[in-house]
Structure formats: C-alpha cells, structure tokens
Regions:
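Alpha-solenoid helical-repeat scaffolds
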Residues: 1, 12, 16, 37-41, ...
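Short, charge-rich amphipathic alpha-helical segments embedded
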Residues: 26-37
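Short terminal alpha-helical segments
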Residues: 1-27, 80-82
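Short amphipathic alpha-helical segments that mediate assembly, nucleic-acid/protein binding
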Residues: 1-4, 18-22, 36, 66-69, ...
Length: 84
C-alpha cells in the first residue's frame, strides 16, 4: 500500500494538484465496495476542506485540518486491509 504513503505526503503539499493526484491514486480502490468508495469520497472532501483552510484561515487551524484528513485516509487504509 505504497499508494497511501504517497497520498499522505500530498496532505502536506495541500494544493489543487495534490488533491487531483490523491484522487487518481485512490480511484483504483473505488470499485472494491460501496463502503470503501464512500470512505474515499469522505477523505477527498476533507482534503478539499484542508486546502480551503490553508488558503483562507490562520495557521493555527492547519494542523487540526491535516489531522482530520490523515484520520480519514487511515479509515480508507483500514477498510482496504479488511477487504483484502
């Protein structure tokens, strides 16, 4: 699951390109189950929210938003591990 290390690195990049790259990397797993697809969508939504937070708010809010995105990504990873 090297893909997850790459996506986790993208969380720190926080750009529109990073969101697109994460979507491309995670799309390969969407067909496994509806639950996994929903978890991926939840992660991507939180990642987009993180981008907004980084661009629009003070730095004190950046780390909590990054932590939330990482938690959502961990959920996707856990679901995929159970599915395999």
């Amino acid at each position: 699951l090297d893909c997850f290390k790459r996506v986790e690195g993208l969380i720190d990049a926080t750009s529109v390109e990073a969101i697109h790259s994460a979507r491309v990397l995670l799309d390969q797993f969407k067909g496994k189950s509806e639950t996994i697809a929903q978890a991926i969508d939840d992660f991507l939504l939180d990642f987009m929210t993180l981008l907004f937070v980084v661009e629009a708010t003070r730095e004190q809010f950046h780390n909590p938003a990054r932590r939330l995105a990482r938690i959502r990504l961990s959920k996707v990873r856990l679901l995929l591990t159970r599915c395999s």
